[in-house]
Amino acid sequence: MTTQLDALRNMTVVVADTGDIEAIKKYQPQDATTNPSLILSASALPQYASLIDDAINYAKAKSTDKAQQLIDAEDKLAVNIGLEILKIVPGRISTEVDARLSYDTAATVEKARKLIKLYNEAGINNDRILIKVASTWQGIRAAEILEKEGINCNLTLLFSQAQARACAEAGVYLISPFVGRILDWYKANTDKKEYVPNEDPGVISVTSIYNYYKQYGYQTVVMGASFRNIGEITELAGCDRLTIAPALLKELQESNADLPRKLDYKGEVKPKPAPLTESQFYWEHNNDPMAVDKLAEGIRKFAADIEKLEAMLSTKL
């Protein structure tokens, strides 16, 4: 019998949304994605102790300044975890820029170059790395610069059509439109508390973005992210990529239910519209209260987890 996971792999690149190396070995995804929250949870696992020690030693050798040591240790730990994952996945690892830089184009570019340099020094070429950046206007501009330097980017915390359009117009390699967090917002802020998968507002958002990209011939990869249940995943079967947490990969592997393709644009390709200006971007994005709330909340949450990671690392410096 074909499992749903195998069926999904036949139409969509399956990516593991985890920093847990054992889970990645088990489900054999093409790529893996990490973020500050996943790095924080992974760093608590005993098998990662040596990676933390290596990051601490690296930071101490680079600088005597405590603040700089903390920054260097964080960056090195994220890359160390990425390097371990790259021993298992045949494709790419996504490593995230510090969320506290989300509104600073120059600082985001500088941090991305540093992360790439650490990977390159470990013998990993750019074509196996995606730099994750929050989909703010400033982050999108940073990604535009990085893409021209041959550094491919994964634009995350993407909730609005305006964000998706601006990313495509900037020539970004890949976007991660969120599904589950959109559902969370609608459940919390409207009277409707239950959704069937094809009416799930997160599913509708990603479907709309996917069709828009195909309709206008944008090459940017659409990788649905942040899932709350397998119904959301099966409704997006056929999406370019889906990044899925281990618990949901397990559910897909244990199911033999039929999995028809849902996303498959067959229409004509139209001429691309003129790119959004900064003011148009903000107008359109800010007209979506869900997107405004979830982008800001996502940046705050990642920043808080970075600070927790720093607190742990600082005890070792």
UniProtKB/Swiss-Prot annotation:
Keyword Heme annotated: no
Pathway: Carbohydrate degradation; pentose phosphate pathway; D-glyceraldehyde 3-phosphate and beta-D-fructose 6-phosphate from D-ribose 5-phosphate and D-xylulose 5-phosphate (non-oxidative stage): step 2/3
One annotated Gene Ontology cellular component of this protein: cytosol
CDD domains tied to this protein: Transaldolase_TalAB
Source organism per UniProt: Mannheimia succiniciproducens (strain KCTC 0769BP / MBEL55E)
UniProt record, GO biological process: carbohydrate metabolic process; pentose-phosphate shunt
NCBIfam families: PRK12346.1, talAB
Pfam families: TAL_FSA
Functional description taken from the UniProt entry: Transaldolase is important for the balance of metabolites in the pentose-phosphate pathway.
HAMAP family: Transaldolase_1
Entry keywords, A to Z: Cytoplasm, Pentose shunt, Schiff base, Transferase
Listed SUPFAM superfamilies: Aldolase (SSF51569)
Reaction equations catalysed: D-sedoheptulose 7-phosphate + D-glyceraldehyde 3-phosphate = D-erythrose 4-phosphate + beta-D-fructose 6-phosphate
Identification of the protein by name: Transaldolase
Disulfide bonds: none
EC category name: transferase
Family: Belongs to the transaldolase family. Type 1 subfamily.
InterPro entries reported in the protein's UniProt record: Aldolase_TIM, TAL/FSA, Transaldolase_1, Transaldolase_AS
Assembly: Homodimer.
Compartmental location: Cytoplasm
Origin superkingdom: Bacteria
